[in-house]
């Protein structure tokens, strides 16, 4: 990818720098927001300038690291005044409260919760601020490096599993897949979760095409030939972000509206064989919280006999909550639903309209009566009955003969 969601300069372990891509401005504007404090981390997560469960956990953790290093190196800074730095126990008390505040930015995403629990454990066992800084730095680096490695594993696990299933079913042709929201490089440390599987499927398809063209392999076999990303209202992560990643990677794709899924399945010239979605939280029985619209996609896939897969690392699995009924679903500001935010386009020639600094102008356009009541949940819960498999870095988990997932080995 030409864009990184998170830029983490770790060349000086005791003086790191962090900036995150403002994803609200994509695909037309590239702007990075510096992260110096926990307040900065809270702000970019809450405003959805950064999104995607893995990326949220990484940015949240990095914001703790940058704040700790800021108060250590600059004890007279504004944020340092929140702490009693001469007393380590008092400092730990304030930090714990700050971590709770950070968690409130996105309570549905279990990755952030898990990371902050781990940071609290590190804090508890640290003898002073310097020791905490060093241990926290090591933890954050490991979190980022493992996320990227696990994304690659998930991609390959999911691609291999789907190809094997299609071959067992006797399918030997080109197929298409569906996806919702954004689960790629912009939602993670790189490569992606659900979009990572799609990337691996595309690599597999290119390899098979090369073999066939060279005459090394004339046997027909299943290969992914097209992707249908959903626009993903109301924040349009599919049209703004996933479409951008697919275009950049030159993966054949066609953007569709959230309301056209069923008709696209019925009329697609290439048979749609699977849907891959990410997850913000998977509970013990496999029920999954993900971007609003995921449930309707799962229901439609069930109706048409299309395989529906959730792709997420182990860190997204909540080993305490039993069912999706107990997941707290965040509701967004109703006003976000009444407007569309985008880049201003010249209606005559389709070019971007720029400001005096040469940057594209963004604006909001009202699309609903201001007086109308709005329900705007950020997520929905897909019951495990509608999920055919959960793809992790450990492999693909399917349901037993009783129709239940057994995720205990991941806990």
UniProtKB/Swiss-Prot annotation:
Function, as annotated: Catalyzes the interconversion of methylthioribose-1-phosphate (MTR-1-P) into methylthioribulose-1-phosphate (MTRu-1-P).
EC number: 5.3.1.23
One family name in Pfam for this protein: IF-2B
A GO cellular component entry from the record: nucleus
Molecular function as annotated in GO: S-methyl-5-thioribose-1-phosphate isomerase activity
Listed pathway(s): Amino-acid biosynthesis; L-methionine biosynthesis via salvage pathway; L-methionine from S-methyl-5-thio-alpha-D-ribose 1-phosphate: step 1/6
Active site: 280
PTM-bearing positions, type Phosphoserine: 351
Protein family membership: Belongs to the eIF-2B alpha/beta/delta subunits family. MtnA subfamily.
Subunit text: Homodimer.
Organism encoding this protein: Saccharomyces cerevisiae (strain ATCC 204508 / S288c)
Keyword Amino-acid biosynthesis part of the UniProt annotation: yes
Residues under site feature: Transition state stabilizer: 181
A GO biological-process term: L-methionine salvage from methylthioadenosine
Extra information: Present with 922 molecules/cell in log phase SD medium.
Protein's name according to its UniProt entry: Methylthioribose-1-phosphate isomerase
Reactions this protein catalyses: 5-(methylsulfanyl)-alpha-D-ribose 1-phosphate = 5-(methylsulfanyl)-D-ribulose 1-phosphate
Modified residues (N-acetylserine): 2
Domain of life: Eukaryota
UniProt subcellular location: Cytoplasm; Nucleus
NCBIfam families listed in its UniProt record: eIF-2B_rel, PRK05720.1, salvage_mtnA
SUPFAM superfamilies: NagB/RpiA/CoA transferase-like
The entry's keywords: Acetylation, Amino-acid biosynthesis, Cytoplasm, Isomerase, Methionine biosynthesis, Nucleus, Phosphoprotein
